[in-house]
């Protein structure tokens, strides 16, 4: 039986000038615990510009997640808690709560290209 194909999920959030720390803190406190409970594994986090926050400029924050195969992807997508209840409203409330701090956000789902290792 083949191993499940790892799927990467890249969150990209553009924080308004001076708001990167607030967005980062909210994501860490309010989003990461639920994502981990849905089976997502946080692989890495980055920011641009590198290393510093410049209060006059927007900053882009990136979080790279992984899930194992299609089953893992559907688990995070369907937003079910361990007790079977639906947490989509919780996720929506989180994104709405940081919207005033951001210029926009993107989420990309990534896999290896066919024929590549």
Positions of PLM-derived features:
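Intrinsically disordered, low-complexity regions
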Residues: 16, 56-59
């Amino acid at each position: 039986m083949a191993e499940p194909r790892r799927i990467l999920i890249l969150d990209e959030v553009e924080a308004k000038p001076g708001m990167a720390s607030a967005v980062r803190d909210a994501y860490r406190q309010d989003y990461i615990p639920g994502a981990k409970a849905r089976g997502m594994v946080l692989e890495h986090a980055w920011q641009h510009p590198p290393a510093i926050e410049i209060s006059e400029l927007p900053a882009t924050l990136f979080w790279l997640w992984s899930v194992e195969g299609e089953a893992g992807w559907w688990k995070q997508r369907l937003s079910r808690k361990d007790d079977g209840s639906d947490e989509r409203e919780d996720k929506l409330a989180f994104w709405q709560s940081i919207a005033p701090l951001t210029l926009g956000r993107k989420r990309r789902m990534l896999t290896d290209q066919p024929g590549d290792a």
